[in-house]
Structure formats: structure tokens, C-alpha cells
């Protein structure tokens, strides 16, 4: 059968079949072959879509993995202008955690990764662009916790008030607070930045999130930069090393 042909071709066992044949699992070599096969199938599907799009008069599909809550600003600040210049390009955007982002890129499901934390297996990726985003505090204009009476705030100002963190920046924030012997009162840790901001909009806490200087927030919120040079995340745009990009991704 095909399994025996493959095992003979690669000179190794690909499956472990437990006694009785009721349980089968991949060997390490089998896992490697499985992942490579998935990538090959992904490339074939991608090529088919590009050919179909080309025949239909389109330029192709741009597939991007993004960290949670990043797509809105990415669309507003970059993709909208890109679309006006290349109106026949289609888009597939996936907002997923870093682990899944890494998997999507390596499997060829997406070609470009935009992340707010280091990708897993970082040696397999090439970073084309990076920038720093500082952590900011967002609070309601009528907040009982902070006042809009100075241009910035200090880390000390955040002690003993309910904080709402986005998960992407929580580890960094806790680390800096620990080093500074500050013990924050964290009310919630949220998967997305938008969820953290929602608490601040309802005036139930102060949101701590990463934000570029150009990002706009609801009119009822006050934005203050936290004056601490340790409180920033590095945003990166990465591709898989040594893998040729599709024509639309190269554009």
C-alpha cells in the first residue's frame, strides 16, 4: 500500500501502530512528512487561487496573520490606501495569537505576519520592518481614578486603581511593575485591546494598551503616555526565511 511505499522511499517508519491496531500515531519522521505535505498542499491551493484570480482579471489575494486587535488600525492606516492603488487585490486577514500566527506562516496559510510579540521559532523568520509602540493609559474624561491635569503619567500614578490590560502587553507591564516594586490592582486581563478599552469607555477602570502615536480613540476617553522607557512593545512585519512570496505579497 501507499504507506509501505512511503516508508520504503524515506527509509524509516512513519507510523506507530499499537497492539491490536486500535491506536495509530505518527512517528517523529511521520510528523515531519505530515507538516511538509500540508505546506505543499497549501502552496498548491495558493497557486490555484492566483491562477484563477489572474484569469478573472484580479491581481491575487494577500494573506496576513495579525496579533489580536491589530487589523482595525492596519486597515485604516495602510490597507485602505493600498487598496485604492491596487483595487483588484483581495484580502484574507487572520487575527490570532502568536502560536497560531507562527503556525499559519510556516504552513503557508499566510505569507506575512504582523505581530506585537516575538514569533515562535524566530530563526525561521525574516523581519522586514519593526517599530516600537509605547503603552498608554486610557481613562474616561469623568474618571474618578485619574485626572487630565498633566501631559503624561508615571507608573506610580497607576497604583491602587483598577486596571484593564490587553493580554499582549500584560506580561511586560507586570515585569516592569515588579522591578519597580509597584503592585498594580488589575481588574481584568483581556484577549483583545478593544475589550480592555471597553472597560475604560464605561468608566469602570483604566485601560493599559499599546498604541501608535497616530491611533485615535473614542472622544470620551483621555489618552496619557506612561513615562517609562521600559514600557513599549516591538511591532514586527515578518515573512518565512527563504520562501518566495507570491506576486501580490511582493507588491
Region locations from a protein language model:
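A short LG(V/I)-centered, amphipathic sequence patch enriched
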Residues: 7-28
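A late-sequence structural motif
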Residues: 74, 222-251
Amino acid at each position: 500500500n501507499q504507506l509501505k511505499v512511503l516508508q520504503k522511499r524515506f527509509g524509516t517508519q512513519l507510523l506507530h501502530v499499537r497492539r491490536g491496531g486500535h491506536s495509530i500515531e505518527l512517528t517523529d519522521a511521520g510528523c515531519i512528512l505530515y507538516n511538509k505535505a500540508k505546506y505543499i498542499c497549501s502552496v498548491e491551493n495558493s497557486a490555484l487561487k492566483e491562477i484563477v484570480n489572474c484569469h478573472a482579471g484580479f491581481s491575487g489575494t494577500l494573506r496576513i496573520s495579525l496579533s489580536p486587535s491589530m487589523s482595525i488600525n492596519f486597515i485604516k492606516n495602510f490597507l485602505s490606501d493600498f487598496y485604492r492603488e491596487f483595487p483588484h487585490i483581495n484580502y484574507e486577514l487572520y487575527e490570532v495569537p502568536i502560536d497560531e500566527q507562527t503556525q499559519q506562516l510556516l504552513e503557508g496559510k499566510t505569507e506575512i505576519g504582523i505581530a506585537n510579540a516575538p514569533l515562535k521559532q524566530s530563526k525561521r523568520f525574516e523581519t522586514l520592518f519593526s517599530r516600537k509602540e509605547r503603552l498608554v493609559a486610557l481613562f474616561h474624561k469623568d474618571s474618578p481614578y485619574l485626572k487630565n491635569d498633566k501631559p503624561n503619567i508615571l507608573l506610580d500614578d497607576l497604583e491602587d486603581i483598577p486596571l484593564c490590560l490587553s493580554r499582549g502587553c500584560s506580561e511586560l507591564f507586570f515585569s516592569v511593575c515588579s522591578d519597580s516594586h509597584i503592585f498594580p490592582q488589575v481588574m481584568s486581563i483581556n484577549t483583545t485591546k478593544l475589550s480592555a478599552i471597553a472597560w475604560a469607555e464605561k468608566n469602570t477602570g483604566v485601560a493599559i494598551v499599546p498604541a501608535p502615536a497616530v491611533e485615535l480613540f473614542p472622544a470620551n476617553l483621555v489618552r496619557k503616555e506612561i513615562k517609562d522607557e521600559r514600557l513599549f512593545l516591538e511591532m514586527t512585519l515578518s515573512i518565512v526565511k527563504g520562501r518566495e512570496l507570491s506576486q501580490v505579497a511582493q507588491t
